[in-house]
Design a protein with these regions (language model features):
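PEST-like intrinsically disordered low-complexity regions enriched in serine, proline, threonine
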Residues: 23-24, 85, 146
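Feature responds to low-complexity, polar/acidic, surface-exposed segments characteristic
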Residues: 1-18, 26, 31-51, 55-80, ...
Length: 186
């Protein structure tokens, strides 16, 4: 049947992220505030929130392994999702801490998707990517892959590597990843 369109007062039908928001909401990967009818597309995404989103997106399953981080007790509502991300090698910590409330950068979000894809062989360059000098050495392959496969383009918004990734950008990345590779690639 026809796909349901979810209406949020802060998502204009012609916004560059409108289709992507509809995609993530209709697939249950992300949700908005349904009482306020807001998706909050410009909001940043915390590392713990991204773990939940990716778990849903990739069809994660509970894991017995523990994730040892100095700033997690194991009682957090998002702990199961973080454990899954870490167990899959999609995310790690920094200096023994996970930093659950830290905001994810554009580059970090792209690295996670690149890992989910199995770190495919990279073809192409970042020669025409305007922020190439800002890409970290460890993120170069992932960003090159995303740029050359159209996961990020200059048409919709600024994909500045170190900038906090927005909910709209995450929605767009996931929709394009699904089109490129398929949702349940984990």
């Amino acid at each position: 049947g026809p796909q349901t369109t979810y209406t949020y007062t802060d998502v204009a039908p012609d916004a560059w992220y409108a289709d992507a928001v509809n995609y993530v909401v209709s697939t249950g990967v992300m949700s908005g505030d349904d009482t306020q009818h807001l998706f909050q597309p410009e909001y940043g995404v915390e590392r713990s929130q991204f773990a939940v989103i990716m778990y849903r997106f990739a069809g994660g399953t509970p894991t017995e392994e523990d994730a040892e981080f100095s700033d997690l007790t194991g009682d957090e509502w998002y702990y199961e999702y973080v454990k899954w991300m870490v167990g899959k090698g999609l995310m790690g910590g920094n200096g023994g801490a996970f930093d659950p409330s830290g905001f994810l950068s554009c580059e970090q979000a792209i690295i996670v998707l690149y890992r989910l894809a199995g770190e495919p062989t990279v073809t192409g360059t970042l020669d025409d990517y305007p922020y190439a000098p800002k890409v970290s050495e460890s993120g170069r392959d992932a960003v090159t892959w995303a740029w050359n496969n159209g996961l990020i383009t200059e048409k919709e918004c600024v994909w500045y590597p170190t900038q906090a990734v927005s909910r709209a950008q995450v929605a767009l990345l996931l929709m394009r990843y699904d089109a490129l590779i398929g949702q349940n690639a984990a």
